[in-house]
Amino acid sequence: MEKTGNRKKHASLRDEQAIFRLLRIAAAAAGVIGTLIAVWLGCIGVSCLSWGIGDRMADTIAASLTGLVTVAIVSICCWRALIVFIRMVGRLSQGSAFTLENERAMAAIAFSLAISGAAILAAFVLLLLICREMVLTMIYLLLLALAFFGVALLAHALSLLVRRAAVLQRDSDLTI
């Protein structure tokens, strides 16, 4: 009976390690795909700079530079969040789930995503002033900013949950 229990325990540990490995791979893949999208958007922004000749030269250049700066800020913040996430998954795979270090990691992820949302929202406002005729693009930008803020809010809530669980676990360890 005891051997069966040990086999199940080892199988579940292998399954957990596989899940953590898959999470790290997925995060790295998201980083690569995100970088490719950022480079593609950057190329579009640079090519739009060359279109800035004629009547709307200042508007086109301002819109292109706004887009390039926004893509750079969002890319840096998302990479920071991904790196923090990958490190946190490493700690989780070692069995340390409810720690203050993981709480700080979730808070850092939330902060990075909130900065990304704020950058997109600032770009939305600037582009609204510059390019009034791009209504559909503006709606997409607003929805993207809201998505970043929503995920940042969830990450912040999880950081608070992990903080409380870490305190409870520490108190429980001290009691034992």
Regions found by a protein language model. Give the residues of each.
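Alpha-helical transmembrane segments and their membrane-interface junctions
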Residues: 115-135
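Membrane-helix boundary/juxtamembrane motif in polytopic membrane proteins
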Residues: 95-113, 169-176
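Alpha-helical transmembrane segments and their immediate juxtamembrane interface regions
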Residues: 139-170
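Membrane-helix interface motif
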Residues: 38-53
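Membrane-helix interface/capping segments
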Residues: 79-99
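Membrane-helix boundary elements
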Residues: 54-83
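Alpha-helical transmembrane segments and their helix-start/interface "positive-inside/aromatic belt" motifs
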Residues: 14-32
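Hydrophobic alpha-helical transmembrane segments
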Residues: 58-68, 135-146
